[in-house]
Amino acid sequence: MIEIIENGLYLTIEVTEDQDVRLLHFGAAPLEVVIADKNKQGFRLLELQLSGEDRAEYHGRTHRASYPGLRMVYAGHSDTVNVLGRKLEFSLADPISGIQAMQHFQFYKGVQIVRSWTVLKNAGEAEVAVEYISSFALTGVDKEGGGERNDKIEVTLAHSGWQSELQWRTYRLPELGMYHLADRGSKRIAASNTGSWSAAELLPMAVLHNKESGTSLFWQIEHNGSWHWELTDQYDQLTLLVSGPTEHDNHWWLKLAPGEEFTSVPAAVGAVRGGFQGAAEQLTVYRRMIRRPNEDNELLRIIFNDYMNCLWGSPTTEKLLPLIDAAAEVGCEYFCIDAGWYAPGEWWDGVGQWEPSSERFPEGIKYVLDYIRSKGMIPGLWLELEVMGINSPKLAETDDSWFFMRHGKRVKDRSRYQLDYRNPKVIDHANGVIARLVEQYGVGYIKMDYNINAGIGTETNADSFGDGLLQHNRAYLAWLDSIFVRYPKLVIENCSSGGMRMDYAMLSRHSIQSTSDQEDYVQYAAIAAGSPAALTPEQSAVWSYPLREGDDEEVIFNMVNALLLRVHQSGHLAELEPHRRSLVKEALDYYKTIRSDIPHATPFWPLGLPDSEGEWVSLGLRRGERRYVAVWRIDGEAANVQLPIEELKGLEPAIACAYPQQHSSTWNWDQSAGVLTVALPPGKTARLFEITS
């Protein structure tokens, strides 16, 4: 028996006399449950399915009971320490096929998370084909605590869609269609993404909470393409399987010739005593540890972008100059010209050259960029470098090798072709565009958008469509890495029609992430408040776009949406009434006094995770003795709301309404209960409180 205790995580791994390797336990407390010997064979360290191999038992559409997964035997393990923390590697081998697998568990100092992945090697004499390989597998996720799993287990997911990102919901297993009626079944709870938008319908993460044991297991899949996880049951236990793309679910299939290797998509898996809040805290710390070191996530400069509820992708010199003046006046530090700068009129299906339009900028775009610099701001431009419009003049310089291909045809989506970043000519094209913007135009900020989903993949130089997509995904990440090496101070925002690619393959590289294209500031409140559960608050870019026809409370609500995160200012600032523009400036001035806390703070939710149908929403950030609490009144007749802050129970903290200073709001602190009661004016209103204990 191998017992591992590290950073508050407890792992128990058994190697039997027959050299079968079983992960009996992974949790935030030691293994105390007695697992019956007859059930232990279901506690696989990994699952691996090769083409032509059998499947065992009743398995339905699940990936459990795989072969040669069930045949893999222990071939050794190592336990070392590197700069990140402790590292476990378990080697397994199949004596029949010759396939070898190395299961990696990388711990990170001081955080209750491991990064887990599997490396396959064909050490046999014949080619093999892989249909499924787990990145992490764990059986018995429900074994702790008394009671029936139908009642004690909850799963929290973030549903996603264009303008409706980060819709957090918590379910009992029966609410997702899984009932505990037998000791094993064919049913699974499956979450999957297929395509180049990694968060198109679900974020690649989840939290499983055991109400009886008071512990939670959580995971995030760190990949910018197709991925899969599932919960299934076997040996009267729940099994979690986490992976990248699969043949069954994502059109991925891979041949391995003798001597060839394949590395699975990595996943971060952790466990805590407590619920979602504890998981979010651990993930926040971990996400900061794996992120590319960069000054942007420390400085948190304020961005103005001219798109949302403003120029809507139709910039000109005439329209931009007054906006630049107004943005500088309120304190913005970047000014990003969004879509449309490269073409007159309608431009959607013609993109690809990324040359400025002389009709939009008669004096040249450098005139406008220099004007931005003269106002003390860093200029930025919008790009969409992974696509080329079907009517782009640039197409004359290309051939089919530049693009995703399926069934001999170029893949089209929304009148664009998907570029294939495995092609050196595509890399040269992308490098040339970046070099021109940075070195010739002096751009310091790029909003990198991506408005198509390329689907299941490409057949070019690939064993399957999904194999082609995975290769491209990894090639794009390698290209990003090269750009950040070349231009370490360049800020590149990750945007995919808002938050359609919100994953930590991308966010371990990008310092900032667009959270949504949501155009309604009231609807945005729940998206903003839920975002720090999916990414660090300093990476979470939230639009604030005061409306020309709004009132003071509309401006305040807009600003509160962004003040605990990363401010993406927009709106027709030059046309706002002076006192309403002064509310924008007041908010940004205040933001500059607190932003040094944001990269070191952890999020909390006094009312629980936000509900887009809820009447009140609240988000807090905590750093040491300081807490910042945003509260939004969305709907309903209740004039006040109670915000529990349990760790302050029995204390008498200093509390102030930090923003706005001159508008009505009342509050009361119940010291014995640890509850802040806030009353806000009727309608759609919001306030930001500062609490010092």
Annotate each PLM feature:
Residues D79, L254-R273, G683-T692:
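Short Pro-Gly-centered flexible turn/kink motifs
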